[in-house]
Amino acid sequence: MNFSYSSLSTWTTLMTLGCLLLHSSISSAQLTPTFYDNTCPSVFTIVRDTIVNELRSDPRIAASILRLHFHDCFVNGCDASILLDNTTSFRTEKDAAPNANSARGFPVIDRMKAAVETACPRTVSCADILTIAAQQAVNLAGGPSWRVPLGRRDSLQAFFALANTNLPAPFFTLPQLKASFQNVGLDRPSDLVALSGGHTFGKNQCQFIMDRLYNFSNTGLPDPTLNTTYLQTLRGQCPRNGNQTVLVDFDLRTPTVFDNKYYVNLKELKGLIQTDQELFSSPNATDTIPLVREYADGTQKFFNAFVEAMNRMGNITPLTGTQGQIRQNCRVVNSNSLLHDVVEIVDFVSSM
């Protein structure tokens, strides 16, 4: 391409003007449910239809998508960093202990992104697609419907070390669990109890409950807070020397439905993993037990609390305005970030 000094000067001027317009318009942008109303209203239908199609062959996918969103937001905020693959510059969060061989649903997000890019190129971030997908997944499983605040942008890197430290482990005590939530700004008891209700559907691997079943706290005995009948059921599914990747339902009552039965289970000492049952059985649970009882007694109370907590979680340090980028492929940072930013500026200015 031949580029004269005059054309370069014009291009530079336009770039400067575009950047000023963009900065003045969205540098202090706040998340809003109407963010894509004019630029990509079809994103919601695209995401929902993708999940509906996937559910036909994979009933677990709704719970898996919700978990992806949770694991994304707890690591440097909801920035789609969990979706990035390994590079020479950083290690993927997919390799971190809380995600390795358990986080799933990435190809489904890829299909959503490809369809959204066809409909609305360079417009919707991967972070927002994952956020919308989590909401739609919950609703399709029988849970509440709500309008999610949008306008996030995508991280330029992954945070492997942070994923290993920020994500709560299945064997956490209640004080440890509270600390992990407070660490990301979720300091209300209702944040912890309502978001834990995401375990009302989906599955978990035997390896994460073996200590509860056979050697709790190195006692050689099962967790004393575990219902004895439920203990025998779980031991049948997860024998001492069996395959520890076998999957067990989080909710023995309605395993694929998003409802309040998770809390009913906790009251009966039938929480699957330690962090679940801690909400009701820990000596430190004086502020969580009343919420477990409240949500067990009323589905709508749980739904209302869950929506509020999801929106609070979705607002953990989002990238907005000129921060980050809008990835074209959720697995990789845009190969030419400067050129892509110029295109974004031109697109934005032309839409004003």
UniProtKB/Swiss-Prot annotation:
What triggers production of this protein?
Late induced by infection with an incompatible bacterial plant pathogen.
Q: Which organism is it from?
A: Arabidopsis thaliana
**Top-rank taxon:** Eukaryota
Positions that bind Ca(2+) 1: 72, 75, 77, 79, 81
Q: What does this protein do?
A: Removal of H(2)O(2), oxidation of toxic reductants, biosynthesis and degradation of lignin, suberization, auxin catabolism, response to environmental stresses such as wounding, pathogen attack and oxidative stress. These functions might be dependent on each isozyme/isoform in each plant tissue. Exhibits a Ca(2+)-pectate binding affinity which could be interpreted in vivo as a specificity to interact with the pectic structure of the cell wall.
Binding-site positions, substrate: 168
This protein is called Peroxidase 32
The cysteines covalently paired via disulfide bonds are 40-120, 73-78, 126-330, 206-238
Keyword list, A-Z: Calcium, Disulfide bond, Glycoprotein, Heme, Hydrogen peroxide, Iron, Metal-binding, Oxidoreductase, Peroxidase, Pyrrolidone carboxylic acid, Secreted, Signal, Vacuole
